[in-house]
Amino acid sequence: MNYVATTCTQPVQVQELIKPYGGNLVNLTVNGEQHRELLEYANRLPSLQLSMRSLCDLELLSVGAFSPLDRFMSRADYQTVLEDMRLKDGTLFPVPITLPVTNRRSVQEGTDIALRSPKNELLAIMTVEEVFEWNAAQEARLVLGTTDVRHPLVAEMASWGGAYISGPLKVLNLPKHYDFSELRKTPAEVHARLQSLGYSNVVAFQTRNPIHRAHEELTKRASEQVNGALLIHPVVGMTKPGDVDHYTRVRAYRILVERYYDGSRTALSLLPLAMRMAGPREALWHAIIRRNYGVNHFIVGRDHAGPGNDSFGRPFYGPYDAQKLLQKCESEVGVKMIPFQEIVYLPDEDRFEEQHRVPVGVRVATLSGTEVRDRYLSNGKRLPEWFTRPETAAILSKITLPMHQRGFCVWFTGLSGAGKSTIAEILSV
């Protein structure tokens, strides 16, 4: 694999909240009179409809979460990222951020195109500077360490087409979200919130799963360990197929933070990230993203961003590969890795403890994800309070209701563009 073939240097000195990666926070959004003029111009341009993955990438490019990137990668940046995990200027950046097109002939270099959402909403104007070919097998092998189609991204890449495009972006509208708008904060907004808490250190916790008692304990200990604030930063874009839906998760996160975390040192914000499930490279990328939100410590667990097992039943990545790579590069990235310690419950003492600190012979209680699903949720049994907060248990219990108790059907008819899809999306929240 190629995910550790790089030299990491350049220690970063932290003063107050850490500065964005590369020094400045990118902002691609256009406002004022120019916005009105470009809206009229964009509606006369040929359009490219983005996939859900590209939509997520464009949103985070626009607000600076991928700083110092200010566009989908050029051929030169793309190739050096594949081979060395660096942009062409030498900046460490482990994951390619690219915009694929299925029909290369539909896009010409030197022209402007309008980028639109999957629902045809106008988002941005790109001046196409490059159209270049790419090799899916090469990218999968170098970035993911595998060409096995059991890896969800390998399977998806087969539908991307044979070309990438790159060029300057003028973002006219960010993607619309009708759910949890108060929690969808930009890097600048999160930075301001964290600054207001008064801590120079911030530890971030990424998750694509519900937060249970052990995770709660871990995050609280981590913020105390660094004497800093805590950013709970769950992914609500594209995660691993089969994950609990983000609507359910965010309802649980919100009530958990409100009732069980110290509001004077905790912030909750949602990250519309399209994960690659790229293991070690992805962990390093996640740390870079968090730095752009004002974070200088990042919790990394076993098999961080791993997609499970390959076609032979073996894990795609080693359990500590992600921790090792981030630890190797943490001084250059400016984000210190905090390893996820296994936390277990001691029923005889009614407390949580790190697994390696538990004396031999002391009784412990744990539940696996399979047990949670098959033993409790699928049978309508409430999860025990030592394992998860009762509010979380109540929310999770609703996702396993019998089908006849789930939701309702609304039938829409009308002309194209009448707003059927928009209304349906709002109702789904």
Where are these regions (language model features)?
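Active-site cores that bind ATP or allylic diphosphates and position pyrophosphate for catalysis
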Residues: N2-H404
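Walker A (P-loop) phosphate-binding motif
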Residues: H404-V429
